[in-house]
Every structure is written in C-alpha cells, then in structure tokens.
Amino acid sequence: MLAASGAVVAAGTTVAAAGPAVAAHADSTAPTPTQALRRLLYGNELFASGHGRHPHQSLEDVRRLAAGQHPFANILGCADSRVPPEVIFDQGLGDLFDNRVAGNVVDDLLLGSIEFGVEELGTPLIVVLGHERCGAITATINAIRTGAPVPGHIAAVVDALRPVVEPVLSQPGDPVENGVQANVRAQVRALVDRSHIIAERVHAGTLQVVGARYDLDTARVTLVR
C-alpha cells in the first residue's frame, strides 16, 4: 500500500493501525518516509477509535523542545478548526510542522514554509490534507455557479482554487467532494513541480509527498489516489 521511499504516494483506502511496528519508531527523530507515514496513520487510527494517547504535551516536553525541533512530518492542511493535525493524528509538541490555509492550497509563502521544513528541519514526509465538506471548496463552487463577487481577500482563495475545481463540476457525484479530492491531487503535484528542493528529495528517495482526506463524520484519514 505504501510506495517506495521518495515517491509521490497515492491510495484510496483507510490504512489500519500498524501497531508495534509504528510504536517502535514513535520517538525517533529521523524516521524513513514510510515509517513517518505509518506513524501518522497509526496515530489517526488511535484518535478515531477513541484510544488517543495525547503524547508530547507536558511541560517536560516544552523544556525538551526549547533547544530545537525535529518534526517527522510536514503538513499542508486547511485552516478549518475541526481539522487540527496534532489532534487528528494523535501527535504533540514538536512532532508536526504545520502549514495551514483555507483550501490547503500552495502559494509562494506556503511553499517557502514547507521547503523550510524539508531543507532546514529534514522532514521526510509531506502530507497534503484536505477534508470532507471543505468550506473553501464550497465557496469556490458557489462563486463559479452564481458569478457573484467574493468579498475581500476571500477572493484570493477562490481564485486559487477555481482552476482546480471548475473542471470537475461536470463529473458525477458530489461536486464538493470531487473538488476536495481534485484539489488534494493538484497540490501534491504542485509541490513537486514547483519546488526543486522537494523534487530532488523525492527523486532521491528521502522524501514522500502524500495526499490525504479527513472525514469529518468518522474522524478517519484516508490517502487520496
């Protein structure tokens, strides 16, 4: 199910808990890309099943991390308050390098931040995390269909998502869900296509770029093909 290290990973099923294999790497500061992905998905399995451990959230952890950070995953997620990466992946302080914006869309600032996580902090995994019933996708669809002006700087979000969302509106199924998944795929491609820092590490096998979707109803994360 997991591609070889360095690939742009894609799948369409929920990944079951990896159990002891993941736990063995839980405190490692330099996991492989595959180990990092398994650790994330195992954490989500714990959270979604009501068995979250809430690790690395003590004052001792605060003091331990004061001298530096070694996150094992780089997250490009939506700003939606219901999708906080540390919570849904059952992680804690210093575990994830978060980059969040409405619609989880890559612009130059977000790309620079993600590259910082890769280049300076050595994260072996990037996850583009979309989610069910995304408000930014919904707003983009409404703007396309009605032609109504979008207020303020929200228009910048809609303009960024429009080229991704518009082509899938004629597809069968729920348009918002189609847009969510199309956007995840598009941002995965954009990270590799626009960043030589990311592309070089992907080709070297030291970095994976993964698309994923969070289900608001079940709390489960699935990888997006």
Predicted segments, located by residue:
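Short helix-loop-beta junction
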Residues: 90-98
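Conserved functional hotspot residues or short segments at active or partner-binding sites
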Residues: 128
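Divalent-metal-activated hydrolytic enzyme cores
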Residues: 1-70, 94, 103-112, 116-123, ...
